Structure formats: C-alpha cells, structure tokens
C-alpha cells in the first residue's frame, strides 16, 4: 500500500514539472512580455471578478500572406473549454487566426470544436506571466512573417459596449464576449 502511495506521489510530482525549452541553431525565440494591462478583470458574479490573461495565437505566414503553421494557441480556444460560455464558441476571440487557417468546421465556423480540438503540440494553458515561444523554421525557409493575435474577454468600452446586440456593427459576443477587437502584431523574419 505504501509502495502504491509513493508511486502515485512520484507520478504527480513529475507531471507538474515544467519542461525547459532547448534552442538549437536556426531556432527562433519569440518572447511575450506581460505589461500592466496583461491581466484583466473578468466579471464572475455579485461584483466579484478574477484576473484573466488574454487569449492569443502565434502563427507564421509566407511573404504573400499565405498561412504556414500555428506555433501556439491558448488552450481555451484550441479546445473550446470556455468557462460559462453557454455554448458560445467565441468566434470573435481570435478572428484573424481563425480565418487565415482556412479550416472550416461542420457548423460553418473557422475555429476548433470540442469534438475536433487542436493538438496539444500547439496549444497550451494561457500564460499569466512572461513566456517564450520557440519557432523552428522549415528547411529552406528564409523569409516569413510571424503574427500574434491577442484578445481579452469583456474588454468593453464606449465603442464596443456589453449592451451591443447581435446584428449591431459593434457587437462582439454579448456580455461575456470580447468587447474591443483583437490586436494583431506582425514581424518579418529575414534569415
């Protein structure tokens, strides 16, 4: 019985270990640094809120704007594991990444489903602190663009209010939607 307990404890401890990312020649490191507004107040109930990190996707495109590959995407959008979404798949969360992938699902939307999630190889928990993403360019790829799309839930303002209704030009998913649109950053890589 003690042996089983020790094995279980050892398994639990090793599963919590963070893997170190090793970089080789030709690998690129993208660093995401947490700023003052990185964690956002997400309303829960009765005026209680929690600090929420943004949803994000990192991908590469060729110089003509054609999608090459997803490097990283946050777990919630990759697996549709939203908290209290009521079935809303949050198509407004990362619209640029969703559309550039050109993967259309049975319901007509361009974002992964619970039945067809993205692989663990490109998805991960939403980081709450600074973090790095590793890119290993394909053999012979010398010039390409790295894009990062970032979006906060419930980031409403006077132009994108929570009160906007479906069909309004400024509708962004309702009271638990995005509010302001996602932001996309791009950098050209020339090896």
Which stretches of residues belong to each language-model region?
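Bacterial N-terminal signal peptides that target proteins for export
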Residues: 1-2, 58
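Sec-dependent N-terminal signal peptides
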Residues: 2-10
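C-terminal motif of bacterial Sec signal peptides marking the signal peptidase cleavage site
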Residues: 12-15
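Bacterial signal peptide processing site
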Residues: 17-19
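Exposed beta-strand and adjacent loop surfaces of beta-rich binding modules
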Residues: 27, 53-57, 143-145
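Short amphipathic, basic-aromatic surface patches that mediate peripheral association
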Residues: 30-51, 76
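Structured domain cores in non-transmembrane regions
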Residues: 50, 61-163
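Short beta-strand elements
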Residues: 161-191
């Amino acid at each position: 019985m003690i042996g089983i307990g020790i094995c279980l404890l050892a398994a639990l401890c090793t599963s919590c270990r963070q893997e170190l990312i090793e970089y080789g020649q030709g690998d690129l490191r993208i660093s995401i640094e947490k700023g003052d507004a990185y964690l956002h107040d997400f309303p829960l109930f009765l005026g209680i809120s929690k600090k929420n990190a943004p949803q994000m996707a990192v991908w590469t495109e060729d110089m003509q704007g054609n999608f090459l590959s997803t490097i990283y995407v946050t777990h919630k959008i990759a697996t549709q594991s939203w908290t209290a979404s009521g079935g809303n798949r949050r198509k407004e969360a990362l619209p640029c990444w969703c559309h550039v992938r050109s993967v259309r699902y049975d319901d007509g939307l361009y974002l992964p489903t619970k039945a067809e999630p993205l692989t663990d190889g490109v998805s991960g928990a939403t980081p709450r602190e600074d973090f790095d993403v590793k890119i290993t360019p394909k053999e012979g790829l010398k010039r390409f663009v790295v894009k990062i799309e970032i979006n906060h839930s419930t980031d409403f303002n006077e132009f994108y209010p929570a009160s906007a209704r479906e069909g309004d030009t400024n509708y962004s998913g309702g009271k638990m939607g995005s509010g302001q649109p996602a932001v996309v950053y791009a950098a050209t890589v020339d090896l």
